Amino acid sequence: MYKRQSQTHLPILGRAHAGTTEIQEGLAVFAEIISGAMDPVRFRRLSDRVIAIQNVIDGADFKDVYEFYRERSEDSRIGREQSYENTRRIFRGGVISGKAPFTKDMVYLNGLLRVHNFMRSVVRLERADLIRILFCGKMDLEDVPAFAQMASEGRLDPPRFLPPWAKDLRFLVSYMAYSGFLNQVKMPGFQSYYQKSLDGVPIVWDFSV
């Protein structure tokens, strides 16, 4: 990631500006997934925030959102205090009567979708080298072509620090290629067969997620 003095030609890459937050947060969530740090509870927490924000936009007040989280608590182990904190997060800086939520949390999933599709695209184009540009500093995905040009001209320094999954791209490339392949294959017969045959099968060894 960007460190002070690391980009001698482009110090602006160390500063946040419009469009960078979504990609930075999306890249962070993608990193959790690709490195195996993401779990179902965390994923559900992110998706619940998006649902709660939309509920407030549609008119839900503080109490409505609190009840929404309480209803979800049985499955995701969210207690009263956490439900209140989750609700407070949605309403911070706004009004408790609804219609004016704090929408920043929506960028997590939207950013994830954009980053994921960017990764798939560069793998399909056999241009995985472009992934490392994302670690040169804070940027929007729309900036990547321009920064690639600058890098070719020696005006963009390579990133000093890379996470393991970006340093060795073999797993990422394999994963994205496989996920792209799965999207092309439609096997509804197999899916319905397994869903019917496995529905109601007892949980083994007390394992659950």
Give residue spans per PLM region.
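Post-HExxH zinc-binding segment in Zn-dependent metallohydrolases
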Residues: 6-54, 111
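Conserved alpha-helical "signature site"
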Residues: 42-201, 206
